[in-house]
Amino acid sequence: MDEELPDAVVFKDQNFSSDLLRQLNGLRQSKILTDVSICSGACEVPCHRNVLASSSPYFRAMFCSHFRESREAKVQLKGISSTTLEQVIAYVYTGEVHISAANVLPLMEAAAMLQYPRMFEACSSYLQSQLAPSNCLGLVRLAEILSCDSLKKKAREVALTYFPEVAASADLKELCVMELRDYLGDDKLCGEEEKVFEALMAWVKHDLQARWRYMQELLQQVRLQYIHPAFFHHFIASDALLQSSPACQAILEMAKKQIFSLYGPSAQDCKLWHTPPRSSYQDFLLLLGGRKDNQQTTRDVLLYSIQTGQWQSLAKLPTRLYKASAVTLHRSVYVLGGMAVREGKGLISCSVYIFSMKLNQWRMGEPMLAARYSHRSTTHRNFIFSIGGTGEGQELLGSMERYDSIRDVWESMADMPMAVLHPAVAVKDQRLYLFGGEDIMQNPVRLIQVYHISRNTWYKMETRMIKNVCAPAVVLGEKIIIVGGYTRRILAYDPQSNKFVKCADMKDRRMHHGATVMGNKLYVTGGRRLTTDCNIEDSASFDCYDPETDTWTSQGQLPHTLFDHACLTLQCIPHMTSLS
């Protein structure tokens, strides 16, 4: 008779379980067939042993084993308030519980004690939804006490993501040294190293006598090589507390070599400085100015995220600048010189504008010594070099000046051997390289001009390999890549061997384009291209070169055609900037 017949069906009442639970709760509320009272102090809640035993391993062990409680009519639960007990029993019979800021902690503790994992996770989810920089450290500790991994993970993520705000809270000063060290050393910490250092010092000074001995251990978690040199000079190097520790002094001396020396630290000192920036930093591609859609010079500033593939507009340049130059230094953007275009008139400028990604604002910087446009600029350590260009009298400039970002001053450096326009420029191994360009008669110059940075001297080398004009150069690995320049050709120059290697050609003959490096790949933007019938067209192309495979791939199109623009890589923490 138990065998299923061919025409048999299985009926399942979807509402039966919930109806049964509702009826059982009605019996409980009417005290019908109840056989035990769960008590908290003077509060007694009548229940059914079989329902409780079925709902939780805790009650199953209590009522189905030979414990005293299995025979008692009243069972006293310690550590649970009467209100919380009533809410838990109501949950057992209905599957519902109202969670609020007022009851979430006692409910969570009761759920942990009485072994109701779903209610426990519901409380955890509620707390996760309430997480903020002001409470995340406290909730990390609560999660540890309650062994709630999901809450601990989420609360720690908030603490790391919003570390500058968390560092300002009183809770940070109450961390033990192990906890603080774990936060400061975490690669996922989102915050400038200046903020990391300030948090360390605030924690130590909160209880100086007891915490001073941890200074060295904590200072080693700060990635000093990424601190702005001016901040290091003014607030760290001369700090009396750090100077009182020989071990901290040694760390600071090593940092000084990395931050201030033209050469960097010696080989034996390099171990500390191999640490990359924290993983919260991302590289973004930045386009500034240039000629847009064959119109007049634009003030637009565009940002591109490789992660999202999206373009975003940032604060416009303060004025229209024709053939200015731009660089990034210490995660700020510097726009130098150019011809300021106002009401159809051009004024050659020595002005410097500095852009803060964090504030999405421009400000004036210290002006250059000479007004120039069509010049080239590059950076090395704490310096910006502004090279050549055209002067106020439309003369071809052979001069070079250097900006010291620590002292905020410009100073004249040695003139280049031969004044050229539109060369490709890059810095590698303490040397500044100028490839090609054109002379005053617009003839291509087949020269490499090399500037020794620490000696302030130039020399030049003739080569038949060079014929580039209006081409950018970038450093990619150990090579300097010269990208086009009225040609499709891509040349990789090895400074050590003084040899060129030809790479895969671009699709078009390009000039007046931009190029930058992100993630060991070369990105080329816009420019002008020579068509097969020798016409010149503005370009909106956006291409990527992979040196590993020696291949080009299209990244789509720029928002519009663009040439004579700046193309830079800017590193920042997305949620701490105008991107958020």
UniProtKB/Swiss-Prot annotation:
GO molecular function (one): ubiquitin-like ligase-substrate adaptor activity
CDD domains with a match to the protein in the record: BACK_KLHL38 (cd18476)
Record-level GO BP terms: proteasome-mediated ubiquitin-dependent protein catabolic process
PROSITE patterns: BTB
Membrane-spanning residues: none
Record keywords, A-Z: Kelch repeat, Repeat
Domain spans labelled BACK: 136-237
Lineage top rank: taxon: Eukaryota
Residues of the BTB domain: 34-101
Keyword Repeat: yes
Cellular component GO terms held in the UniProt record: Cul3-RING ubiquitin ligase complex; cytoplasm
Residue windows of the Kelch repeats: 284-331, 333-382, 383-430, 432-478, 479-520, 522-572
The organism's taxonomic lineage, starting at the top: Eukaryota, Metazoa, Chordata, Craniata, Vertebrata
Protein name according to UniProt: Kelch-like protein 38
